[in-house]
Each structure stands twice: as structure tokens, then as C-alpha cells.
């Protein structure tokens, strides 16, 4: 198959593209190479993808509609996987315009592109942050998600709403999948796991917010990629509406549109996560206990029922196994070879 994937120099986009290329598919990757974090890491990811003749890269911003058109002409995609975004809850407090530009204007450009070329399936990356401070657990796709705690979450919810309207108007089958704290090799340096491991190795304290009592539904990257690939083969339609006894389906009554959680439903308390990291690294961390930051939520906890009903799969890699794999990657790429990154 032929895919157009945005954000292929990013953590998740890199892994999704690599999986599809390794399976023999053709992928055009679109990425703006923004300096939100070390661009060298993004360049290294793209360099790996570019070893294959099944990958072509277009470097441009999502706000550049003409560049998106060029990428689509090159890809002739059957499936579009829109992963590029301005990520990060805390950064949205400092630079809100970046979120409006990438997550609203950029996503609107993607919807306009899908309207023009009518792919078999449009897939959009969303986030568990949409659930805000939801007290009902686990978080199900049909739960209220209209009280975002950050601009980042608000832009992602807005993207979902725009996508539903386009799916209704132009009949492009569209799936919005909500991530839950994704981690693993080649992960972002601003994420907790990378920061914790790097700090421990370099003798710096780690900041533990919420006194360590917050919990997160950590999702290992390979599990997420498997979820996305399987969902790509299930474009929303009445033919695959899920029976109520299996899960509450979010398939719209008015459009070929569906929202799906991609978490495994196994939340871990932050202090337990820290202890797991310490064990994998082989030394204790220096703990700097802090209150919750503005915009943080006390917990995330996915219901994987709909994902499993649609694909026969739910994330299962344990935090212990996933953290160990990340530490092994970090040791090979940072601890032993700092000058290469």
C-alpha cells in the first residue's frame, strides 16, 4: 500500500513509518524538522528511514498547504496517517501560537488535502489529554471530553471536531486515535523517561511532580505501532460497527468517523515508574519532590475495549520490559556515544 505519514522525523512517526517500510509498503514522510527538541535526533531517525527505497521525505511545515500537495502527489496515498503536531502539555503554556499553527491550521490543511484526494482512510493522532481531569475510570471514548486543562488538549479536541465535520461533509473515512503516554527507544528528550534516565546517569536530581502520586497509562511504542497499523485496515463504516456487548462504539451516526483509545488500561503510579527506571539503570535517582504542575492531571487510564473489539489487539508490554528496552537503547546511543547525538 501507499502511505502519506506526517511527523516521520518524530518519535511515533518514525516507528510507524519504519514498520510499514519493513513490511514492503511505500511511505512518503512529511516533517517540518522543528527545533522543539534536538533536531539532530530527528535527522538520525530520518536517515534510518532513507536507507530504504520505499521511503521519500518532504521537509516542510504543516501550515504550507502547497508542500502538502506536493507530498500527496509523490505519495498517491491510499492511507494518510497524520502524526505531526506541536506536542507537549507544559510547552503549550509558554508558546501557545505554535499549537494553533500546527494543531489547528496544520490539521485543517490536512483535512482539506483529504477532501481533495479522497484516501481510503484518514488517521489522526489525538491524545488522552482530551479527557482532562476526568474522574471516571477507565477513560472510555464516549466519555465527556469537553473540559480540556491545557491549550494542547483543546487544539487536539478541536481537530477531532473539525475532522468529524469533514467526514460528514466529504465522506472520507476518518479515525482519531488517542495516545496514552507513549515511551520507548528513540523517544523524545523532553519526556519523563528520557529525562529520568539521563539525569540518573549524570548525577542530576529528577523532578517528581504531584509528590509521585500521579498515575499514567504508559504505552510502549511497539504496542502503539501495532494498534495504528491494525486500525489502518479498519476504516470506519457501518459494516464494522462494534456490537454493544463488546464495547461502546464511537462510530458516528452521521459520518464515517470514529475515536479509538490506544492505551492498554494498565496505569502505573509515578513513584512506581521511578523505581522501575532506577532498577533498569542500576542506581538510585536523586528525588526532587514537587507539587503538580499547572495543566497536569492526576491520572490517565485507558479503556482498551473498543481497540480490542476492532483489531483483536490491546497493548500488553509491561513497564518493566519497556523501560529496560529504552535503557538499553539509551546506553548504546547516549551513554557510550554522547558525541553522536
Curated annotation (Swiss-Prot):
Required cofactor names: NAD(+)
Broad enzyme group: isomerase
Catalytic activity: UDP-alpha-D-glucuronate = UDP-alpha-D-galacturonate
UniProt keywords, alphabetically: Isomerase, NAD
Signal peptide (residue range): none
EC number: 5.1.3.6
GO MF annotation: an example: UDP-glucuronate 4-epimerase activity
Knocked-out gene: effects: Mutation affects lipopolysaccharide (LPS) production.
Annotated S-S bridges: none
SUPFAM superfamilies attached to this UniProt entry: NAD(P)-binding Rossmann-fold domains
Top-level taxon: Bacteria
Active-site residues from the entry: 152 (proton acceptor)
PANTHER family in alphabetical order: EPIMERASE-RELATED
Family under the similarity heading: Belongs to the NAD(P)-dependent epimerase/dehydratase family.
Protein name listed in UniProt: Probable UDP-glucuronate 4-epimerase
Organism, scientific name: Rhizobium meliloti (strain 1021) (Ensifer meliloti)
Native organism taxonomy: Bacteria, Pseudomonadati, Pseudomonadota, Alphaproteobacteria, Hyphomicrobiales
Gene name of the record: lspL
Amino acid at each position: 500500500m501507499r502511505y502519506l505519514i506526517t511527523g516521520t522525523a518524530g518519535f511515533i512517526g518514525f516507528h510507524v513509518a519504519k514498520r510499514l517500510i519493513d513490511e514492503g509498503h511505500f511511505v512518503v514522510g512529511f516533517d517540518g524538522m522543528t527545533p522543539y527538541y534536538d533536531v539532530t535526533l530527528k535527522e538520525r531517525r530520518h536517515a534510518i528511514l532513507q536507507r530504504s527505497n520505499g521511503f521519500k521525505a518532504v521537509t516542510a511545515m504543516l501550515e504550507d498547504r502547497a508542500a502538502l500537495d506536493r507530498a500527496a502527489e509523490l505519495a498517491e496515498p491510499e492511507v494518510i496517517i497524520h502524526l505531526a503536531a506541536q506536542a507537549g502539555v507544559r510547552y503549550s503554556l509558554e508558546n501557545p501560537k505554535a499549537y494553533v499553527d500546527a494543531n489547528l491550521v496544520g490539521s485543517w490543511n490536512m483535512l482539506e488535502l483529504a477532501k481533495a484526494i479522497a484516501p481510503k482512510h484518514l488517521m489522526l493522532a489525538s491524545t488522552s489529554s482530551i479527557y482532562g481531569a476526568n474522574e471516571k475510570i477507565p477513560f472510555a471514548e464516549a466519555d465527556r471530553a469537553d473540559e480540556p486543562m491545557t491549550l494542547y488538549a483543546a487544539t487536539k479536541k478541536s481537530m477531532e471536531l473539525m475532522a468529524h465535520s469533514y467526514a460528514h461533509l466529504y465522506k472520507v473515512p476518518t479515525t482519531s486515535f488517542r495516545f496514552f503516554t507513549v515511551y520507548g527507544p528513540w523517544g523524545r528528550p523532553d519526556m519523563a523517561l528520557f529525562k529520568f534516565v539521563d539525569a540518573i546517569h549524570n548525577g542530576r536530581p529528577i523532578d517528581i511532580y504531584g509528590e509521585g502520586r500521579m498515575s499514567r497509562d504508559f504505552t510502549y511504542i511497539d504496542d502503539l505501532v501495532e494498534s495504528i497499523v491494525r486500525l489502518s485496515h479498519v476504516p470506519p463504516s457501518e459494516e464494522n460497527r462494534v456490537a454493544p456487548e463488546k464495547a461502546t462504539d464511537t462510530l458516528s451516526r452521521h459520518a464515517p468517523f470514529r475515536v479509538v483509545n490506544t492505551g492498554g488500561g494498565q496505569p502505573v503510579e509515578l513513584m512506581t515508574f521511578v523505581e522501575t527506571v532506577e532498577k533498569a539503570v542500576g542506581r538510585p535517582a536523586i528525588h526532587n519532590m514537587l507539587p503538580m504542575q499547572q495543566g497536569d492531571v492526576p491520572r490517565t487510564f485507558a479503556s482498551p475495549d473498543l481497540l480490542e473489539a476492532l483489531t483483536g489487539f490491546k497493548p500488553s508490554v509491561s513497564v518493566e520490559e519497556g523501560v529496560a528496552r529504552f535503557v538499553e537503547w539509551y546506553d548504546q546511543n547516549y551513554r557510550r556515544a554522547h558525541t553522536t547525538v
